[in-house]
Design a protein with these regions (language model features):
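Short, basic, glycine/proline-bearing loop/turn elements
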Residues: 42-49, 87, 118-126
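Conserved nucleotide-binding/hydrolysis micro-motifs of P-loop NTPases
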Residues: 1-2, 9, 13, 50-53, ...
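Phosphate-binding/switch region of NTP-binding enzymes
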Residues: 92-171
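Conserved P-loop NTPase nucleotide-binding/switch module
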Residues: 4-15, 78-102, 125-128
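Charged, alpha-helix-enriched surfaces in structured cytosolic catalytic cores
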Residues: 2, 23-27, 34, 41, ...
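Cytosolic-facing regulatory segments adjacent to core modules
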Residues: 1-69, 83
Length: 171
């Protein structure tokens, strides 16, 4: 439900805070209505299964590729997935998940975009720009990924509002 609301607000170009607090200006309700109609027709399938395993994701992905011809999978986020039993630690578990998502993308021949949390190390640096070593719980993510993209929002760490809402993309 939260993800759907975020998507709706992004599509409508409406600040989600206004929707949540009931303070959406009346002139923006039209934008929200148009976006809701557009999204209803969009081929987007949301699955918020908690602690989904790669095996469960693979089965669902195969079915959606066959039945709905989906063209991309987004995992939000990698560290919320459950890895196989019997691994020694969380780093190994994330490594197995990362490798399995890469194999899934090759198997079903569509992109699998996996979002990841960052470690707290990024907050210890002066510039706070994320780096590959900041990917949380595994170095395997950077090895398995075809591309790693970071969003850097300097206004989050600053008192100045001049660039609020803007983000730098680091590839």
């Amino acid at each position: 439900q939260q993800l759907a609301m975020r998507l709706l607000c992004a599509e409508a170009r409406v600040n989600m805070h206004f929707v949540r607090t009931g303070k959406l200006p009346s002139k923006l309700w039209k934008n929200l209505g148009i976006a809701a109609g557009d999204m209803e027709e969009a081929p987007i399938y949301l699955d918020d299964t908690p602690a989904i395993t790669v095996r469960e994701l693979r089965a669902k992905a195969r079915r959606l590729v066959a039945e709905k011809q989906i063209s991309m999978i987004v995992v939000d986020y990698l560290q919320l997935m459950q890895g196989p039993r019997g691994v020694e630690n969380r780093q190994q578990e994330i490594s197995v998940i990362s490798r399995s998502l890469k194999a899934l993308a090759k198997e079903i021949d569509i992109p699998v975009v996996a979002l990841s949390q960052l470690s707290r190390a990024v907050e210890q640096r002066q510039d706070r720009k994320p780096q590959l070593s900041d990917l949380r719980e595994s170095g395997a993510i950077e090895q398995d990924a075809d591309v790693v993209i970071f969003l850097y929002r300097p206004w989050v760490y600053s008192q100045e509002d001049e660039d609020e809402g803007k983000a730098e993309i680091i590839v």
